[in-house]
Amino acid sequence: VLGVLSIIISGIMLKKFKIFTGDPAPFVMELPAYHVPTAGNVFRSMWERGSSFIKKAGTIILLSTIFMWFTLGYGWEGGAFCAVSDIDNSIMARIGSVIAPIFTLPGFGTWKSAVAAISGLVAKENVVATFGQLYHFVGEVAEDGSEIWSELAADFTQVGAYAFMAFNLLCAPCFAAMGAIKREMNNGKWTALAIGYMCAYAYVVSTIIYQIGGLITGELTFGIGTVVAIVFIALIIFLLVRKPAKADSTDGLRRMSVDAN
């Protein structure tokens, strides 16, 4: 629901900017007649999708997991670079500590949660593997996952967890999808704009969820974060109700020129 609603809201807001204005164009898609799929087609599709995920898991996810393992296992202790006994002294802890303040407003401003969120840009599946390494989820756990929840509760409130999931749902997809966006748009600037918008929109929505949700549930008190969330809400409402920008006769030519380049 959040994803579909975000698509509708984004479409309305972006249409108000001059760069996206233009005459509505009809979209016609010719659909073939529906048939019951054959067993061969089903298994072929299953094989293609399964092999694609295996290749992805064996390359991007594996390499990123190895990188996470190394940066979490090594760092500086006692003035020397070595295998660390405390994860807070690792290379990744230092990197995450620099990134973490950015995610304070959305409610996951610890270095562990910030690293997990960034790892989702490599592959969304990577967030789970990153959590496993950061919080030492090894061996078997109870059916209700009580061991996992007790570990995560130290870094996430209930509303903060929802904000974290919303951010990962709405932010830029994995590297493979970013590559597909680049191929379809055939323009580096438009690709950067699309990815930047998705990340910014995800940040705004997750901030609103955490700050307003925390205020309603009593997890937070009214403060600067609440004011920022209200400003974000007001900005979204303004972009939704404002009048669309008027397109001039050269807009289409400029867009065609940009796309061609």
Give the location of each predicted region.
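Long hydrophobic segments that form regular secondary structure
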Residues: 15-23, 34-81, 97-100
